A protein has these predicted regions:
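Alpha-helical transmembrane segments and their membrane-interface junctions
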Residues: 123-149
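Selected alpha-helical membrane-embedding segments in polytopic membrane proteins
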Residues: 18-20, 24-88
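Short, highly charged, low-complexity non-transmembrane loops/tails of multi-pass membrane proteins
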Residues: 173-178
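Short membrane-interface loop/juxtamembrane segments of multi-pass integral membrane proteins
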Residues: 27, 100-118
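Select subsegments of transmembrane alpha-helices in polytopic membrane proteins
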Residues: 40-50, 116-128, 162
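Short, charged cytosolic
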Residues: 1-25, 92-95, 99
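Small-residue-rich transmembrane alpha-helices that serve as helix-helix interface/gating elements
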Residues: 147-160
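Membrane-water interface of transmembrane alpha-helices
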Residues: 84-101, 168-169
């Protein structure tokens, strides 16, 4: 009788889960919101740090004057290094949240702390991104194709950034709600 009750309870619980969710849960591919945040921060940190290597390689452009080229390389390297290190710090902070040993209040408090830092980092880095784009456009204002590329790249980056920010905020919301 007890086994029948357990089986019926499990069937009721699983009937509310979609088939894809059911497969994800039992295959181990399903991640928590904390794991999603950590994974996303790690990916952004790696991308930011890779762009530090990319910056000097791609700005070897003969159209830019030598002294301006060095300024662009230094500014972009510092910018991407800062982005990567900030994301790495957020990644390590999110990974340090342990739901098994912390109370719900501690988990929520730390998640809100890192959410606040994330938004502060955006507020710091966004003006520098606009300055970086402005420096590039100023130095290559004669090259129409480059200006179109910068404009379209900025629009695409803005759209992707907003989408990723919404994913970050949704994960933070799912951690701190209730």
């Amino acid at each position: 009788m007890e086994e029948d009750a357990k089986r019926e309870w499990r069937d009721i619980r699983l009937s509310t889960i979609g088939s894809q969710d059911y497969e994800d849960i039992y295959s181990g591919r399903r991640r928590t919101a904390l794991e999603n945040l950590a994974h996303r921060y790690k990916r952004f940190a790696i991308i930011g740090l890779l762009f530090v290597i990319w910056a000097p390689l791609t700005f070897y452009n003969p159209e830019i004057q030598i002294d301006n080229r060095l300024t662009i390389i230094i500014f972009s390297s510092i910018y991407f290094l800062t982005c990567g290190l900030m994301d790495l710090w957020l990644y390590r902070g999110i990974r340090s949240i342990d739901c098994a040993s912390m109370t719900i209040k501690e988990v929520a408090t730390r998640a809100l702390f890192y959410r606040k830092r994330h938004l502060q980092f955006i507020a710091i880095l966004l003006p520098f991104a606009f300055i970086w784009i402005g420096i590039l456009c100023y130095n290559l204002c004669d090259n129409t194709a480059f200006l179109w590329g910068v404009g379209l790249g900025a629009l695409a980056g803005f759209a992707i950034g907003i989408r990723q920010l919404m994913k970050f905020l949704n994960d933070y919301r799912s951690i701190t709600e209730d």
